[in-house]
């Protein structure tokens, strides 16, 4: 169960990162160049509301100083549609994964985003770019369980990531 939670959490992060290139149907070519390169998570905000069991609801924020959670995640985007994600090494040392790196492919077709491998149903997540410039990237991902597969448990959550561009 813990491994499934970690995989789904990583998938949420990865899909959120990849979704940055899709900006509401606008021309995405400029975003590919601006996003290209290596980014590291500077802070992370998570809000979760469980309508089925209120006691499970939570809200928390982490910054780079919280070394047990933030400061290890990084992603490198290439304009050719590939991305390399570096996970926290503790997942590897715990035996959950054999390699801290996961390679992904992404592409945009119209307003739709496609990710491979696809671990989380794209139709339960909505993405928004809150800030994007040469040094900072802020994205917000909103998920809810309106998908029929999840109708037995009603929940909603927001993930907000603030990234800093890695210095060369």
What positions do the PLM features span?
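Sec-dependent bacterial lipoprotein signal peptides
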Residues: 1-22
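Lipid interaction determinants
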Residues: 23-168
């Amino acid at each position: 169960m813990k491994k499934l939670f970690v995989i789904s959490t990583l998938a949420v992060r990865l899909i959120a990162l990849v979704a940055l290139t899709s900006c509401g149907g606008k021309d995405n070519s400029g975003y590919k160049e601006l996003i290209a390169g290596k980014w590291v998570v500077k802070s992370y905000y998570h809000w979760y509301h469980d309508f089925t069991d209120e006691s499970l609801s939570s809200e928390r924020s982490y910054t780079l100083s919280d070394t047990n959670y933030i400061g290890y995640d990084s992603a490198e985007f290439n304009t050719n549609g590939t991305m390399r994600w570096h996970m926290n090494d503790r997942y590897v040392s715990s035996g959950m994964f054999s390699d801290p790196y996961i390679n992904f492919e992404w592409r945009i077709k119209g307003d739709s985003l496609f990710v491979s491998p696809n671990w989380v149903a794209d139709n339960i997540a909505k993405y928004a770019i809150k800030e994007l410039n040469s040094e900072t990237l802020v994205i917000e991902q909103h998920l809810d369980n309106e998908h029929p597969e999840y109708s037995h448990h009603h929940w909603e959550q927001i993930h907000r990531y603030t990234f800093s561009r890695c210095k060369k």
